[in-house]
Amino acid sequence: MKIYTKKGDKGETSLLGGTRVTKADLRIEAYGTVDELNAFIGHLYDQYKNQKNILFEIQKTLFNIGNILSSEKEESQISLPEITNNNIQMLENEIDKMGKKLPPLKKFILPSGHSLSSFCHITRTVCRRAERRVVALNLKPVKFLKCVQYLNRLSDYLFVLSRLILKENNIKENTWN
């Protein structure tokens, strides 16, 4: 199977289901940003040994979100994976576990101090952009709202992970004011 089809050479692509849309379509922008986020998570997976299982689960969930967003219709006849409360709860559990190892947050933290911590912040901002892109679709079914909730919680996870990396490396957080 060839990787190239030449079907996108005129600025169009297909949704899951076959409908052709412009590559500037909001849905393409949304799942493209989720794909970008997944690549950033992959880099964290490669660089940070302490959260490999969680980061791998996050990557699989982001791939599922991409499939959901790329479906042709809001109520697709195609069997798609679901984002559930369990996916969101996994992130919340990890946030709580990491948070117990950290001092209380009293000031705004600047994204700096260690390259991996800073990369968590870069990834967090990509996550927030992905969330905004999904919200811009203004899709109401629960499956889309769960995607928004997951992305929102994932940005929190990445923030707390950035703090934990600093603590593990005995680096003081740089704060604003």
Q: Can you name each region flagged by the protein language model?
A:
Residues 1-177:
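Phosphate/pyrophosphate-binding loop motifs in nucleotide- or prenyl diphosphate-using proteins
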